[in-house]
Amino acid sequence: MTATHTDGAVASEPAPRHPLAVASLIEKHAATIAKADAAIADRGYWSHFPESPSPKVYGETAAADGQAAFETYLGGRFPLEQPGATGWVATERSPFGVALGVEYPHSDVETLVTAATAAMPAWRDAGPDARTAVCVEILTRIHEHVFELANAVQFTTGQAFVMAFQAGGPHALDRALESVAYAHTEMKRHPATADWEKPAGKGDPLRMSKTFHVVPRGIGLVIGCNTFPTWNSYPGLFASLATGNAVIVKPHPLAVLPLAITVKYAREVLAEAGFDPDLVQLAPEAEGEKIASTLALRPEVKIVDFTGSTQYGDWLEQNAHQASVYTEKAGVNTIVVDSTDDFVGMCRNVAFSLTLYSGQMCTTPQNILVPRDGIDTESGHIGFDEVAAGIAGAVAKLVGDDARAVELTGAIVNDGVVSRIGAARSHGEVLLDSREVKHPEFPDAVVRTPLILKQDSANEGMFDSEWFGPISFVVATDSTAQSLEIFRRIVGKKGALTAAVYSTDESVLDAMEDATLDVGVHLSCNLTGGVFVNQSAAFSDFHASGANAAANSALTDGAYVSNRFRIVQSRRHV
C-alpha cells in the first residue's frame, strides 16, 4: 500500500553535535584505513566492526536504545531534510506482519540530480585522503546506531534478529570499509604531483611541474534490494562516494528504512565536516513511479549499482549506456557430491545453508548433484536415496521446533516466494515438504520451512533456472563426471555466485576447481564445520566474480572501484 501526502512539515534533522575538522578526521581514521589497506592485500582474517550483539561488546543498554530509536520512526515521517521534497511516500510492509507506516520525503528527479551535481566540486577538491576519512567517519557514525539499523533490517527484510544485526550491520559495514580501502588504494596508485625534467642536449633541461587530479565520473545511482538492503548497497555507495561522486540511493520499496537511516547519518557527517549533505540523497519511489529507470538513463548518472532480478539487471546493462553499470543478478548455485569422510557433518552443513533465511540469500545452494549409484563415506558406500534422506533429515531436524526454526528461517520476504514454493512442488518428488510455521513472537509473520525435491538428470529443464526461496533439488546423475558436465552447462549459461563440492578424491576436487574456473564461480570444498557456502568474509572472500551471468562485478576488487573516477592532469613549466 502506498500513501502520498503533501501536507505538513518534515521533522527537522538534529543539529550537528559538533563541527568536524577534516584534518582531524584524517588523523583519527589513519590507523583504520592503513589496516584496511593491508587487509585487502593480505586476504587474511580482519574485521573492524564486532559481529556479536552481546552487551559485553556494545554495552548493557545498546540493544534497548537501538530498538527504541527504531520504534520512534514507526507510523511517522522520517526526519530527513532533502531539497525539493514535494510529498511523502510509504510503501513498506513487514514480513513479520508488524505495522511500519514510515513515510519518506519524495523529491522529483530533476531536483535530486541538480542538487547532487552542485555538491560535487568541493567534494572532488577535498582529495582522496579527506574523502576516505569522511567515509570512514560515516561508517563509524552508522555503527554507533547499529542496533537501530539492525531492527530496521529485521522488520523490512524478514531476517531473524541476529542475522539482521550481523549481515545488516557489522558485515555490511566491513564490506563498505573494504570498498573504501580499495578506492583509497586505487586513488593513491598515482602520485598527486610530479617534477619532470628531460635533458635537452647542451641547453637547459626541460622542466615541468605536473599535477594529477582524481576526478569523479558524475552521479552514482545505488538501487537497493529487498533482502539485503545494506549489505548489497554499501559497497557501491561508499566506493562511489570515496572516489568523489555524489550518490543517489534508490531503496527497494519494501526495504526503505535501513537505507533511509544510512542516508540520514551520512548527510549528518557530511554537513559536520563542511561538505554539502546533498552528496548523499534518498530517492524513495511512489507506487508505479519507476524512478530507478528514470534516474538510470539520466546523462548526469555515470555509475549504477544494482542488486536484483536478472530481467531488470539486463535492462540496465542494455540501456544505461552513459554509465558504468555494476549488477548482481540471479544464478543457479550448485553442490556436487562425490564422496565424504564426514557424512553427518556434510548433511548438517548443507542443511544449515538451505535453511538460513529461508533460502533467500543470493548465495544459497539450489541444486545438489549426487551419483544415482551413491557415494563412499567414512562408514562405507551408501545409496542415492540415503544421501538425499540424510540432507532432508538434517533440514527437518533444524526446523522441527518452531521457536528454534524461526531464528534460522526468519520470514518470507514477499508473496512471490510463497507462490514459488507452491509451484515448485510439481517439479519433482517431494523429499521434504515446506510447511507453514506460526511465529511465537509475531503471529502475522509469513514463515515457511524449506522444500526439498528429488529429481533426475534427465529432467534438467526442471532445475536449470533459479528458484528463489527455500527450494532445492537433490538430483540423481549417472556419475560425478556427469554432475560436472551439468554444473558446467547450467552455470555456464545461467551463472552462479557459489559452488561447493564434497569429495575425498583429490582428482575430483581438482576437476571441480577446473570447472569453476571455466565458468567463473567461487568454490568451497568439503565444508562440514562452522563455515558455510552461502557466507563470505569481507577483506578475504570475494563475493561474486564478475566472470559469469550472475554478476558482472565482484565485491570487492580493484576493478569495482577504479572505473568510478578518472585521472586528469595539468602541467606547467618550471
Which residues fall in each region the model found?
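Short, flexible/disordered intra-domain loops and linkers
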Residues: 258, 375-386
